Amino acid sequence: MGGVLEGVRVLDFGRYIAGPYCATLLAEFGAEVIRVEKRDGSEDRFVAPVGEGGEGALFLQINRNKKCITLDPMTEQGQQVMRKLVATADVVVANLPPQTLRAMKLDYDSLKATKPDIILTTATAFGGPGPWSDRVGFDGVGQVMSGSVYMTGAGDPPYRAAVNWVDFGTALHCAFGTLAALIERGKSGRGQIVEGALLATALSFTNATLIEQAVINVNRVPTGNLGQTAAPADIYRTRDGWVLCQVTGHPLFKRWAKLMGEEELWLNDPRFADDISRGNNGPVISERMARWCAERTTQEAVDTLGKAMIPTGPVLSPQQALDHPHIRAAGFLQDVDYPGLPKQAPVARAAVRLSETPGEIATRPPTLGEHTDTVLAELGYDKAAIASLRQSGII
């Protein structure tokens, strides 16, 4: 495949998003990633099924460029295979609770006994140390415990974001940490643990809100889509849809006032002197912007705001996002084949481009156990030994 991480072998014991997407990012830039699954397929393979075999949209998104083997690591024979595999690896990714890592012998001490310079990248729900360190959780626990859900929507009921931003943010942090650990190992020869946590990620994303609360005790309450620290910042109805407009900073506000044709009104009123004042008086500004948008189609509003260099975008359905001319022209999505799909899957490339050494989606996601025989043969197992492991239910 090539890439900046060519020669790095990663074992992906991850499940769902935080671990697997971390490994995906490493694979996209050249690492050899081997996904290790249960014999009958791990649960995350089948989330939101779209294929004849039950493979889901999430699996297709976060498992391109990977090999896949099946293995039962809870047996002695499975442990033997795993130790041989670990001995060839640079990184193990496993977003599993500490007690599960210990039971599977994927804890750092066990891995280090086999490969002294191994890097273990792991992510838990709550991190630690702390009274909740051994508890399990998904993306939503980070959202609800960071202040994000409290501040989303109108407050009753609170709303969790539909997109798993905590999981994906944790994957990004873990990939960054893994790269840093690989650089350090190149200098010192030492491996280490890279530890992410869903709650830590969520708190890092909401941190400015927490700082404001801690320092000045502002006690903000949710206000729907209406921004609270600048204006206009809201989602507005147009003649045929909805459009977002976000204005932060006085230069942008001056552009907006000029576009409204009311510079004297908006730029000389002390209620709108700076961002926080505009945020405090957001409903007044938003009402004016709402009237402006209501007179236009979404396309007219977006084009006019865009030409004025005011941040804006249309509210798109998933199908509209797929069809949007800029998204298509930019090549953010790559059509990928997979056995049993009625059509190609539009898989999002890594959202960062390197000018000289770009990442690539070089291979489709693997079928269950597609590379088991090949990987085991590389470890020294002959056909008879592989057949015996399969007969015994180890692979």
Report residues per predicted region.
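Aromatic-enriched alpha-helical interface/lid elements that frame and gate functional surfaces
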Residues: 232-308, 312
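N-terminal helix-loop segment corresponding to the beta1-alpha1 unit
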Residues: 1-177, 181-187, 367, 373-395
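Mid-domain beta-loop-alpha active-site segment that forms a flexible
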Residues: 164-179, 198-206, 248, 252
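Oxidoreductase and adenylate-handling cofactor-binding alpha/beta cores
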Residues: 171-191, 204-215, 257-263, 267-268
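Short Gly/Pro-enriched turn/cap motifs at secondary-structure boundaries
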Residues: 59, 223-228, 233-234, 342-345, ...
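Conserved PLP cofactor-binding pocket of PLP-dependent enzymes
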Residues: 306-330
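Flexible, small-/acidic-enriched active-site or ligand-binding loops
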Residues: 341-388
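Conserved Rossmann-fold dehydrogenase catalytic segment
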Residues: 128, 155-166, 186-202, 221-228, ...
